[in-house]
Amino acid sequence: MDPNTVSSFQDILVRMSKMQLTSSSEDLNGMITQFESLKLYRDSLGETVMRMGDFHSLQIRNGKWREQLSQKFEEIRWLIEEVRHRLKITENSFEQITFMQALQLLLEVEQEIRAFSFQLI
């Protein structure tokens, strides 16, 4: 796993947790939770690819991994749209920078998960 991606996730999560948006903080907490979940999923998928022999154990352990993958892509798309929306409505430069970095990270992670999944198929 790329150490820059890890630090990017951690940096964005810390920044988001410090933000006090005028909108519901529950929405932001939900985004943070989904970011954390996405990071864990990406990490576990990456580890599985690194140990290609684990693909069979992944299939045995979770026969619905394709369905899970599809759900993660839906979550990513939702997060991308939510981050884009937040980026459009915020006027605070700290928040704008945070959301721009979050958007870039989401696009990178989506690409990485696609690459991992193609290796597993």
Curated annotation (Swiss-Prot):
It holds the Pfam family Flu_NS2. Coiled coil: none annotated. Keywords: Host nucleus, Host-virus interaction, Transport, Virion. A motif (Nuclear export signal) lies at residues 12-21, 85-94. InterPro entries: Flu_NS2. One of its GO terms (cellular component) is virion component. It comes from the Viruses. It is found in: Virion; Host nucleus. One of its GO terms (biological process) is exit of virus from host cell nucleus through nuclear pore. Mediates the nuclear export of encapsidated genomic RNAs (ribonucleoproteins, RNPs). Acts as an adapter between viral RNPs complexes and the nuclear export machinery of the cell. Possesses no intrinsic RNA-binding activity, but includes a C-terminal M1-binding domain. This domain is believed to allow recognition of RNPs bound to the protein M1. Belongs to the influenza viruses NEP family. Interacts with protein M1. May interact with host nucleoporin RAB/HRB and exportin XPO1/CRM1. Average number present in a viral particle is estimated to be 130-200 molecules. This is Nuclear export protein.
